[in-house]
């Protein structure tokens, strides 16, 4: 994947996360979202955080959550965990739901 292709796909991930947080906040969720360059910080009511950031040199998107740190690469049309193969948005949904204590959905 070229650098340009990576940046286009990775920025689309950040935009989708932002849209999903907005949609969750339109419901019962209260998630504070802060963007600083290529880093998104999601802060939940209980003070816990999830950080999503881009890693251009490695062509990866990373998630840091209570559950741990996870690296995702674009493989076969989806961002996949480099260890487990889990899809990015499905995994982020699980981490956010766990930390928020309520269902939070993320999708592309």
From Swiss-Prot:
One of its GO terms (biological process) is iron-sulfur cluster assembly. InterPro entries: CyaY, Frataxin/CyaY, Frataxin/CyaY_sf, Frataxin_CS. PROSITE patterns: FRATAXIN_1 (PS01344), FRATAXIN_2 (PS50810). SUPFAM superfamilies: Frataxin/Nqo15-like. PANTHER family: FRATAXIN, FRATAXIN, MITOCHONDRIAL. HAMAP family: CyaY. This is Iron-sulfur cluster assembly protein CyaY.
